[in-house]
Amino acid sequence: MKRIVVVSGLSGAGKTTAMGFLEDLGYFCVDNVPGNILEELLKLFMSSDLEKMAMAIDVRSEHLGDPISTVERIKEKTNALVIFLEASTEELLRRYALTRRRHPLQKDGLGLEDAIEKEKEILSHIKEIADVVIDTTRMNTHQLRETLAHFLVNQAGGTSVRIMSFGFKHGIPMDADFVFDARFLPNPHYVPELSSKTGLDSEVEAYFKNYPVVEEFIEKIFEVLKVAIEEYQRTGRRIITVGIGCTGGKHRSVYITHRLKEMLEREGFTVIEKHRDIEKV
């Protein structure tokens, strides 16, 4: 089965890294697809021996046609996976300061921060129709490639669920569709023999088994996610991201994330488990 991936997103958010990774995976990569040759390009790909093609579409494509309508047409005509990359304005400013590159919308006296905000506005609809939105604010190159690999593995299937534990003190994952707050639950951090362990350790699991409210909370989240996933499958959504947060992202959120993965997999769902802050202090 032929695969098509569309990569869009904010300048400086990692599109070059993403396209390089896709090329390493054997995708035929096309940068800034002109809208007026899209139909011909798709026909050539479908009739060729190529199995995988990736297309990058961003604000630089504006002089070659409307990037939004281009992405919409690709989604209408193919089973393409649309990936949108973003990062916080502060992080994009930092990255541009390091590279000293000029933002593609920085012209006619427009400052960098204003150019970033203008780009967010232009591409907002592509973000809305994307199958996957990845916030790269706290990601390095390796983590972005790893995240892309997870999504690409599941491209051919139905709706996949990405469950991420995190610590609120390290920031909420901006790409999460759902965020659940576990900070009200008993905290093993204050038990000396458990403080250095994580929610993946059997001793921490045994601790949580003493508190029925923990299992009740997990069951409630599970029921919500089941309803949401089934509805997303009906509407064709490929990926949903769920954030489970506690204070530091080491005990409560990790345990709940792992338990939910097991429960959802038993229901036949494809689940990606990630513990963002488990190694942080």
From Swiss-Prot:
Pfam families: PapZ_C, RapZ-like_N. GTP binds at residues 58-61. Keywords: ATP-binding, GTP-binding, Nucleotide-binding. The keyword GTP-binding applies. The keyword Endoplasmic reticulum does not apply. InterPro entries: P-loop_NTPase, RapZ-like, RapZ-like_N, RapZ_C. GO terms for molecular function: ATP binding; GTP binding. It comes from the Bacteria. ATP binds at residues 9-16. Belongs to the RapZ-like family. Displays ATPase and GTPase activities. This is Nucleotide-binding protein Tpet_1006. It comes from Thermotoga petrophila (strain ATCC BAA-488 / DSM 13995 / JCM 10881 / RKU-1).
